């Protein structure tokens, strides 16, 4: 009985390791090194009308600051951007690793900010027309809204981590 328990325990150990190494949907090389206090765009997510901005602070306790900025007041979001501390994105909970953005520090070549952008699909198939476009017709949308059959929105979230040794 003890042997079977230990075998099951050993077989389950690698599972979290594989989950942590999820392959992102979008792969890009690392961004160009950024100077301390230089505000830069990390990623734009037009579906959520959101731009992720960041900057290295020079503070050892919080070396990188990441902010979410609304792209435009007129932008109508087709996706939600959720706080990663509230939703804890992971593949186990239905999220997909969309992209991993690496931003090296110009003043400390051993340190980089790593931003994981996660996407949670709405879970529905989108019907495309003959031109390959998703069309939303006002009268159909009003009818669906009146019937309480609004489509779920996809969601995005971003997780910030620091990699490498601090230079101070």
Task: Show the residue positions of the predicted features.
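Hydrophobic h-region of N-terminal signal peptides that target proteins for export
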Residues: 10-19
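Sec-dependent signal peptide recognition
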Residues: 2-10
């Amino acid at each position: 009985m003890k042997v079977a328990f230990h075998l099951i325990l050993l077989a389950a150990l690698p599972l979290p390791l594989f989950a942590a190494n999820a392959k992102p949907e979008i792969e890009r090389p690392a961004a160009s090194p950024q100077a301390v206090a230089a505000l830069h765009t990390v990623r734009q997510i037009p579906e959520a009308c959101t731009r992720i901005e960041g900057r290295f602070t020079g503070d050892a306790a919080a070396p990188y600051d990441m902010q979410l900025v609304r792209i435009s007041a007129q932008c109508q979001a087709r996706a939600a951007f959720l706080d990663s501390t509230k939703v804890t994105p992971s593949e186990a909970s239905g999220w997909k690793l969309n992209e991993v953005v690496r931003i090296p520090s110009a003043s400390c070549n051993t340190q980089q900010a790593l931003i994981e952008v996660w996407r949670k699909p709405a879970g529905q198939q989108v019907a495309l027309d003959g031109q390959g476009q998703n069309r939303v017709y006002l009268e159909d949308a009003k009818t669906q809204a009146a019937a309480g059959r609004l489509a779920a929105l996809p969601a995005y979230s971003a997780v910030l981590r620091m990699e490498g040794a601090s230079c101070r």
